[in-house]
Swiss-Prot record:
Gene3D superfamilies (alphabetical): Adenine nucleotide alpha hydrolases-like domains, HUPs, Translation factors
Protein name: tRNA-specific 2-thiouridylase MnmA
Alphabetical list of PANTHER family matching this protein: MITOCHONDRIAL TRNA-SPECIFIC 2-THIOURIDYLASE 1, TRNA 5-METHYLAMINOMETHYL-2-THIOURIDYLATE -METHYLTRANSFERASE
Biological role: Catalyzes the 2-thiolation of uridine at the wobble position (U34) of tRNA, leading to the formation of s(2)U34.
Length: 399
């Protein structure tokens, strides 16, 4: 077996590397080239090239495409740029805006991985005769240890917990996992940068991207209102007890758990508890109204060895769950019953927003297996807050 778990020599193994123009994917290309693989670099142009030319660190546009090209020249490998602007707009940007209109807080990186990167680019890699598509994500994949699944691979958290990207990859399908490779899963970020300098790559000291790649300076409201003007329609700010406290200029400016910038002064600390998109109401309440031990999921992607129904019916499936990208996995139980698919959290959370993800794991540590996860459809609050919210949502809205 070679280092990518193929039963042939590296020079007989073609690998397409998804190159964003950042240090991680560049080092992946360099490592595979050093190991003797037949490497091709592909960069996807995902949004307005002209608008992004002078924006560094934006990923997959402008300067980043040029950086990827220069890295490939240094490494002596072919580099191709594919125009996926239309596809990216249809599958990532438009759903991002629609999600905000629906009162959710979306994660566009998951949608991008689900569609453009791990579906479209993966198909292109296969058309080019590649044995695998490699990326710079910090996650590990290995052959599935179960004898009942020969030839299959499984996902595991990376060695560098601070760079763990498994939360954003919960929706990766089994077919995609079998084809993908993640060479940086066992490395700390500091080692990745050291390797980039050792290879003489122009991106060795390039800063990591921080914002959503297609949102300049984090001003997502500008993009949303351009695509969905009704997202900026005014509405009421209402307390859980029914009091109208003020007005707002669009639910897109709010997210569950928000305290600052609500635009009202009441003398009591209030948080955004719910976004009633249908009636354009921002519902606020005390911090305890955000607390939950149960989240309901939609679009569940299950990566366990038995079926989801087999695992989660009855007493449920004991696992660890992560409802925020920055949190460590915490004890939980996955259930399926007549009410839907849901996760009971042993340790309660607060401010969980619909549209975010819940990733599932075998254990809390850095070698935990990833069991998939789902998008959060709703959370069930503590009984008193849940009753107040249901009563408020059922009440008529003033014209």
């Amino acid at each position: 077996m070679n280092t990518l778990d193929f039963d042939k020599q590296p020079e007989e193994t073609r690998v397409v590397v998804a190159m964003s123009g950042g240090v991680d994917s560049s080092v992946v290309a360099g490592l595979l080239k050093q190991q003797g693989y037949d490497v091709l670099g592909i960069t996807l142009q995902l949004y307005d090239h002209g608008a992004a030319v002078h924006r560094a660190g934006s990923c997959c546009a402008g300067q980043d495409i040029d950086d990827a090209r220069r890295v490939c020249e240094t490494l002596g490998i072919p580099h191709y740029v594919l125009d996926y602007e239309k596809r990216f707009r249809e599958t990532v940007i438009n759903p991002f805006a629609e999600s905000y209109v629906a009162g959710e807080t979306p994660i566009p990186c998951v949608s991008c991985n689900q569609t453009v990167k791990f579906a479209d680019l993966l198909a292109t890699a296969k058309e080019l005769g590649a044995d695998a598509l490699a990326t710079g994500h910090y996650i590990r994949s290995r052959p599935n240890p179960s004898p009942e699944h020969p030839g299959r691979r499984a996902l595991y958290r990376p060695a560098d917990a601070d760079r763990d990207q498994s939360y954003f990859l919960f929706a990766t399908t089994q077919e995609q996992i079998d084809y993908l490779r993640f060479p940086l899963g066992g490395l700390p970020k500091a080692e990745t940068r050291r390797l980039a300098e050792e290879m003489g790559l122009v991106v060795a000291k390039k800063a990591d991207s921080q914002d959503i790649c297609f949102v300049p300076q984090g001003k997502y409201s500008d993009i949303i209102t351009k695509l969905k003007p009704n997202a900026a329609l005014a509405g009421e700010i209402v307390h859980l007890d029914g009091r109208v406290l003020g007005t707002h200029e669009g639910i897109l400016h709010f997210t569950i758990g928000q305290r600052r910038g609500i635009g009202i002064a009441t003398g009591e600390p209030l948080y955004v508890v719910f976004l009633d998109a249908r009636s354009r109401r921002v519902i606020v309440g005390p911090k305890e109204a955000l607390e939950t031990h149960r989240v309901y999921l939609r679009d569940v992607n299950w990566l366990g060895d038995e079926t989801l129904a087999q695992a989660a019916t009855g007493d449920g499936f004991a696992c660890y769950a992560k409802v925020r990208s920055t949190r460590a996995p915490a004890p939980a139980v996955l259930h399926i019953d007549a009410t839907g698919t849901y996760v009971d959290l042993t340790v309660g959370e607060a401010g969980i927003a619909p549209g975010q993800a819940c990733a599932l794991y075998s254990a809390p540590g850095d070698n935990a297996r990833v069991f998939g996860g789902g998008f959060i459809e709703r959370s069930e609050r503590e009984p008193s807050a849940e009753a107040s919210l249901k009563a408020l949502l059922a009440s008529p809205v003033a014209a």
